Amino acid sequence: MADLDLGEKARAALPRCDRLPAVGTTEQVLGGMYVFEGATLGGQFIARHVEATLGLTGGRGYSFFCSYGVATGRMWQAFRATLSAYAPRLDGDSIVASACETFDRFHNWIVDGRGERLTCP
């Protein structure tokens, strides 16, 4: 935000996510991490688009999408290995439900009154 020259007042006016997903169980943590790590992986595509479209470089103005930088693929593979190691011993339906809840909460925060609420089945 600082790279985009947003003033303190503009930053303070941005909506806050006040309904974070639950993370009280290992299943909830893994489900939430699936969404976060998947978004991090997808951020690489967004970063390239922002660079090409807006002419920004070096992550300035879009560093959120660059997170792990060149280590993004390696971090995704590490998460997949962790998920694969734990998932067989846990309740898979709970992991999926937590991923859906995490996605729903962040989606609803972003659209906040500008679109239809999303709810995973």
Model segments located where?
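Metal- and O2-centered redox machinery and metal/ROS homeostasis
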Residues: 1-121
